[in-house]
Amino acid sequence: MAHGPRYRVPFRRRREGKTNYRKRLKLLKSGKPRLVVRKSLNHHIAQIIVYDPKGDRTLVSAHTRELIRDFGWKGHCGNTPSAYLLGLLIGYKAKKAGIEEAILDIGLHPPVRGSSIFAVLKGAIDAGLNVPHSPEIFPEDYRIRGEHIAEYARMLKEQDEDRFRRQFGGYLEKGLDPEKLPEHFEEVKARIIEKFESEGARE
């Protein structure tokens, strides 16, 4: 371990790989709410957070589990289509709460062009949330709809059906043919839009 008079011990959350304090300071200086996006292997989570001296306050949040529970999503919750749907959900929740704009906070996730993190951002923007961005960072539309997954499933089924059933067992158990994922994506997307737009009409 480094030592000496010039050595400074990093903050605990930086040592643990949880917070980049330089990036956090830049985000806070914007004065805007943060669209915080985090991912694991199997899920995504999105939150609208504002700074408070006593601790950050979460205004609205969304988890990919909600896609299953409330909108009948049968696909995997760690892929690009589910990430977009989560973004759509958090975007509508933000609008319902009166939040019109935010700035993206991806934490320590690398800013990889076309990644599922940016699929969340695309969904939020399509829902009407104003977030500064460059369109080049978004995944292609065919990936957002899950066409690449459907095509891979089709190829795998033709080449090795046993492997196909192992790899897509989760889909099949829920009654979803992975080759039909793009159509299922559109159905769930329509349910999210219908829910929030019908609520807006009643208000």
Curated annotation (Swiss-Prot):
One of its GO terms (molecular function) is structural constituent of ribosome. Pfam families: Ribosomal_L5e. The keyword rRNA-binding applies. It comes from the Archaea. HAMAP family: Ribosomal_uL18_A. NCBIfam families: PRK08569.1. This is Large ribosomal subunit protein uL18. The gene is rpl18.
